[in-house]
């Protein structure tokens, strides 16, 4: 399944998105914004910092993590890096005062995930709610970087627990150092599927 996922994500990156961008302005901006970001020369911007990386799909999901971010910021040596996948979230970055650096999340190919993690050099990583990106999580696990999923919500009908995705998804979920879920029902679903690195955070 991991091999199949990588084939699909490469096809999306190299073929499907470029074709669709001809007809869809939003997809065209998606490609252009990430290309511009990748071409900038940031040098060793993040090499010496104690970087904590948060990833959210949108501004709404980011707001779920503000309490954790404010706690982390008590350590003045840390730098908070925030990534968005959506254009709408990124456009509102100037409203977010707690963040030191904001980027678009590159697509989850093996090379792009590896290069981006190398670039931002995180010491800890927090994915918010339902943001599960296999190659990013696999690379973070390989580099032994503590990675957390916060404010997660799981139901027994979720794709994670369906054949043929089950083993693939379980391996990803078990890579997290800790999964913080919204309610006991979510915890019970994970425990039932032998995913024990879970705590109810409310």
Name each model-derived stretch.
Residues 17, 21-202:
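Active-site and donor-binding regions of nucleotide-sugar-utilizing enzymes
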Residues 1, 5-12, 16-23:
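Membrane-interacting alpha-helical segments
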